[in-house]
């Protein structure tokens, strides 16, 4: 299936619901009863490392996609019922306004910055989850820097410790009655390796994400989070500190009972006690069904965004000689093309590229996994070198995987065809490139024209960069 950005590029709420419904059935078949999804985060900072899990940066579209996703995952609009998988919408709230694009799994990315005073717009997509009666909410690790509600500044702590965000706004203003599940390890310490990165030769491990409350003890963090509104702690298997807090009269048993009731109610509503087992044979016949894969392939094709098609290069004609980069030769051969070993021998070149990124924080556990930094293709980028090489010799088709909004200025002027993708197989790509049907995918975020424009935009405001190369919602038909 197309990734969530691809579903946003399609823009069909019912398709998103269908996608989540299929996932629900596969999850249930193998015994998964809770999903840490969807992300309702608004991807307003184009450098952010976790855009690929979102539905983009248009508040209305994200709202609608989130609503459809939860209805599919929970088997309807009435909250948890038999056949539901518990959906956990995340990350409440403002996670996508990541300062400098750095993610708050890391100490160097613990802040989301609200210089545009735009928290209200980040809240709006979550109302789609509330309309679908979402079962659970996960707060963000991030400290919302410069953010305020009703003119009152937010306490500078991660959302899992914020009474304002969890009790006053989420439960009070929006009437959320479900489970608040913290993100993982928010009560753990961030030690020196977590703060400074590991020395050369040492393997990094996850540290704690107790942003804003680093001066508290782990037990004090548990108390503060529970008092803020947290019901359940992600990644915690030892409850002794909570027991100690009750025994020391820092928390009441009545308050813990409120959380226990919420958690148990979910288990009862989904039938987990009555029917905790799965049938392995049924699972084998459910997961990866051929008819579902056919639907998934169709969605992948619909999610492709045609950004440029010069000189009528598309659709590609079968039988042509083709030079490939990042594409399996067998897929091209099955599609009816003759694969050659140099652009000079080809009629056309097809290149699969990845949105550019940097990894300046490889000494951190999550930093070494995250795509950070510049969005621009540079001369030493291997994908860009392939584009330059091919475009000197032959009409070139480039498809760029847009896990972040790449700057395509120096790709657009070399390639005849440019296509944005959000996860597409080689087979589906060839089916689409040889089809005469119109493209229907639209960009779920804008593509900036330069890194200067990226640096000047406000991290909490959607699609606000100066003179974008491609505006949000852009997509050619042919």
Model-inferred region functions:
Residues 29, 186-190, 215-218, 240-253, ...:
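C-terminal non-catalytic regions of proteins with extracellular/luminal or membrane-system context
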Residues 54, 246, 254-256, 260, ...:
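Helix-enriched interaction subdomains in cytosolic or periplasmic regions
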Residues 8-35, 60, 64, 68-71, ...:
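Active-site-adjacent structural elements in enzyme catalytic domains
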Residues 24-32, 70-78, 127-131, 171, ...:
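Sec-exported extracytoplasmic/periplasmic mature domains
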Residues 57-235, 240-241, 254-255, 262:
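Second-shell residues forming the walls of enzyme active-site clefts
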Residues 2-13, 46-65, 101-120, 147-160, ...:
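Glycine-rich tight-turn/loop motif centered on a GG-T
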Residues 25-28, 33-38, 43, 85-89, ...:
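Structural recognition of the beta-strand scaffold that forms the well-ordered cores
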Residues 20, 24, 63-70, 123, ...:
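Extracytoplasmic/secreted envelope proteins and their assembly/folding machinery
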């Amino acid at each position: 299936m197309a990734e969530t950005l691809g579903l946003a590029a399609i823009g069909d709420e019912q398709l998103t619901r269908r996608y989540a419904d299929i996932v629900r059935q596969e999850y249930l078949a193998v015994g998964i009863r809770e999903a840490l999804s969807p992300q309702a985060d608004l991807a307003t900072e184009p450098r952010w490392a976790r855009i690929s899990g979102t539905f983009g940066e248009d508040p209305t579209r994200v709202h609608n996609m989130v609503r459809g996703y939860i209805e599919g995952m929970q088997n309807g609009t009435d909250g948890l019922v038999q056949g539901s998988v518990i959906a956990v919408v995340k990350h409440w709230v403002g996670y996508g306004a990541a300062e400098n694009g750095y993610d708050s799994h890391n100490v160097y990315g613990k802040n989301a910055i609200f210089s545009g005073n735009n928290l209200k717009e980040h809240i709006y997509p979550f109302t789609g989850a509330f309309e679908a009666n979402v079962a659970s909410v996960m707060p963000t690790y991030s400290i919302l820097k410069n953010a305020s509600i009703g003119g009152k500044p937010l306490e500078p702590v991660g959302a899992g410790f914020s009474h304002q965000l969890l009790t006053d706004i989420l439960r009070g203003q929006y009437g959320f009655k479900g489970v608040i599940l913290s993100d993982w390890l928010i009560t753990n310490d961030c030690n020196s390796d977590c703060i400074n990165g590991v020395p050369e030769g040492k393997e990094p491990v996850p540290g704690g994400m107790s942003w804003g409350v680093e001066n508290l003890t782990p037990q004090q963090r548990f108390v503060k989070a529970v008092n803020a509104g947290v019901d359940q702690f992600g990644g915690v298997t030892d409850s002794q500190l909570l027991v100690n807090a009750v025994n020391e009269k820092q928390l009441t048993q009545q308050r813990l009972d409120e959380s226990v009731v919420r958690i148990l109610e979910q288990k009862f509503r989904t039938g987990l006690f009555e029917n905790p087992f799965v049938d392995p044979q049924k699972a084998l016949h459910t997961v990866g069904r051929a008819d579902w894969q056919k639907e998934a392939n169709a969605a992948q094709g619909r999610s492709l965004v045609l950004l440029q098609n010069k000189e009528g290069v598309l659709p590609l004609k079968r039988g042509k000689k083709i030079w490939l980069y990042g594409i399996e030769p067998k897929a091209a051969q099955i599609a009816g093309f003759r694969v050659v070993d140099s652009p000079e021998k080809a009629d056309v070149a097809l290149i699969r590229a990845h949105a550019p990124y940097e990894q300046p924080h490889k000494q951190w556990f999550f930093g070494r996994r995250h795509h950070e930094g510049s969005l621009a293709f540079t001369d030493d980028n291997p994908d860009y070198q392939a584009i330059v090489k091919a475009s000197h010799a032959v009409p070139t088709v480039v498809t760029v995987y847009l896990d972040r909004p790449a700057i395509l200025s120096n790709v657009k002027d070399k390639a005849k065809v440019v296509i944005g993708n959000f996860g597409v197989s080689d087979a589906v790509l060839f089916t689409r490139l040889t089809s005469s049907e119109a493209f229907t995918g639209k960009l779920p975020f804008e593509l900036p024209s330069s890194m200067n424009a990226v640096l000047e935009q406000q991290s909490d405001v959607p699609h606000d960069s100066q003179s974008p190369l491609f505006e949000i919602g852009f997509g050619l038909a042919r």
